[in-house]
A protein has these predicted regions:
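Glycine-centered recognition micro-motifs in short, flexible terminal segments and loops
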Residues: 1-12
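Long, compositionally biased, intrinsically disordered regions
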Residues: 10-232
Length: 232
């Protein structure tokens, strides 16, 4: 079983990334604030949705539903670099891994986060609040140390004692995924130019990580990346 924070890369006459990068969630910070009793509390739901999706995307090479993939156990793992010729470098299949992961994360979580929002609206209405809600627009940005989630949905909440209105829900979730995806991209680049001979250079570069390679039958290779400090 893969450990938290670990990235595994498979090469089956190709390079397949199974980035089992479990989000290192420390906190979620909503930027909205209502009077006591009138809050839209769905940050926990958003956290769960993002975490679940990151785990799934990680195990499928960064794709929610990959079309060009390798079946590994119960996962369909997308090829990120591929060749069907021995002794020839593989050809990169995904130009910008972090951006692709970001887009797939947005696509995979959009409807679920909308559902989180609607569930919170229903809860407020059940408590007697008058709520005007809207279809939300989701933006997700991966940055160093964070997953930034912006859910825009013009909403107003009112009761006999007053009301509030707002446009955006802004969440910031601590995560190592951006850095791990960047390192995975470096491994892909190394395979293209140097094969697995570049692993020693990468070990020196990322000295705080434990980088291992395991060769499989049929030309397969498994790379693993583990944080030396946290052992995740």
């Amino acid at each position: 079983m893969l450990k938290k924070g670990q990235v595994t890369i498979f090469i089956i006459l190709a390079i397949i990334i199974v980035a089992a990068i479990l989000v290192y969630f420390l906190w979620v910070r909503p930027t909205y604030n209502f009077q006591e009793g009138g809050q839209l509390n769905f940050e926990g739901c958003v956290e769960d949705v993002i975490k679940e999706s990151v785990e799934k995307l990680g195990m499928q090479g960064g794709f929610a539903n990959p079309e060009f993939y390798y079946d590994y156990k119960t996962n369909s793992v997308a090829y990120l670099c591929y060749t069907n010729l021995y002794y020839r470098p593989c050809i990169r299949q995904v130009a910008f891994l972090s951006q692709k992961f970001e887009a797939e994360l947005k696509k995979d979580t959009g409807a679920k986060i909308q559902s989180c929002y609607e569930s919170s609206v229903r809860e407020l209405r059940s408590k007697g609040f008058d709520v005007k809600d809207a279809e939300g627009n989701l933006e997700i940005d991966l940055s160093l140390g964070k997953i930034n989630v912006l859910f825009s949905a013009p909403t107003s909440v009112s009761s006999d004692s007053g009301g509030s209105s707002f446009e955006d829900f802004d969440f910031s979730i601590n995560s190592k995924i951006y850095r791990l995806l960047s390192i995975a991209s470096s491994i892909v680049e190394s395979e293209i130019h140097s094969g697995d001979g570049g692993i020693e250079i990468l070990r020196l570069t990322y000295y705080d990580l434990n980088l291992e390679i395991e060769r499989q039958e049929g030309g397969s290779k498994i790379y693993s990346i583990e944080d030396e400090t946290t052992k995740e």
